Amino acid sequence: MSAPDAGREDTRIPLVAVVGPTGTGKSELAIALARELDGEVVNADALQLYRGMDVGTAKLTPEERQGVPHHLLDVLEIHEEASVAAFQRDARRAVDEIRGRGRVPVLVGGSGLYVRAALDAIEFPGTDATVRARREEQLRERGRAALLRELAAVDPGSAERVKDDRRLVRALEVHDLTGRPFTSFMPERRYVQPTVQIGLAMDREVLNRRLAHRVDLMLERGWLEEVKALEARGLRESPTAGRALGYPQLLAVLDGSATLDEAREDTVAATRRFTKRQRTWFGADPRVHWLDAGDPNGIDGLTAGAVRLVAAQ
């Protein structure tokens, strides 16, 4: 793909998104595509936004990035809360700047809502710390069941979907602030600019074995030591980072409530459950073009297939 004059955004340049479950090789394909298409990579993994969360998020090292510019890595401190609305703003700015340089933006990640926020027409309601604090206090005083009944009266769709207290409080906060149900802010499947979504699929049993091996490699590469260092910086109290896959399990090792073997098994199981949710999320989007991550020609075959998909748009 030939690049137009730098500094002038070319609306013919598509946004390429590489999506799919954890462990399928998305980062490797994104690098290969960026090199092939004269592109730059934009991170859409919510946890790779955090500085210091490297081993446990499989963040590529500078050497592994092979000279390809990367955006939205290491932009948050561990105590900060990740915001999908802020990510949307920053990701779209990065994409526009890349296209303005005449290069191809390659978005990569498995955080479904973050990907949709970057790609699709979606509006995010604001937040209010005072309203949230009041709702959190009500949760402590009145209990989850009472607040769930209140939510069901004004937003039955959200009441059926909320899986934890954080989402329950958020749904009530949104209704308090806007008078609208949280479900009314759900994204449309409508791209805000020309986009090609490429998904990586893998046989479930093969992926499960890869995930177990991946956790073992992370532990060998110093994941427990990483968690110990992050604990000193506020990992336990972090509203987002502290709940990342594997990190609570390793914090339990540090405080003596679990063995390393138990933490490993729990992490592997949690990661497998997470990839199941990712398959459901991305599989529900008919716009995703799926490639077999087990291509017999490896990364070269995947890259060639992805380039053909981009060229066909």
UniProtKB/Swiss-Prot annotation:
Keyword Transcription regulation belongs to the record: no
UniProt site positions, description: Interaction with substrate tRNA: 111, 132
Cysteine-cysteine disulfides: none
Keywords attached to this entry: ATP-binding, Magnesium, Nucleotide-binding, Transferase, tRNA processing
InterPro entries: Dimethylallyltransferase, IPT, P-loop_NTPase
GO molecular function: ATP binding; tRNA dimethylallyltransferase activity
Residues engaged in binding substrate: 22-27
A matching Pfam family: IPPT
Top-level division of the source organism's lineage: Bacteria
E.C. number: 2.5.1.75
Residues that bind ATP: 20-27
Cofactor(s), names only, from the UniProt record: Mg(2+)
Alphabetical GO biological process terms: tRNA modification
UniProt catalytic activity: adenosine(37) in tRNA + dimethylallyl diphosphate = N(6)-dimethylallyladenosine(37) in tRNA + diphosphate
Family label: Belongs to the IPP transferase family.
NCBIfam families given in the database record: miaA
Subunit structure: Monomer.
Summary of the function given for this chain in its UniProt record: Catalyzes the transfer of a dimethylallyl group onto the adenine at position 37 in tRNAs that read codons beginning with uridine, leading to the formation of N6-(dimethylallyl)adenosine (i(6)A).
Protein name: tRNA dimethylallyltransferase
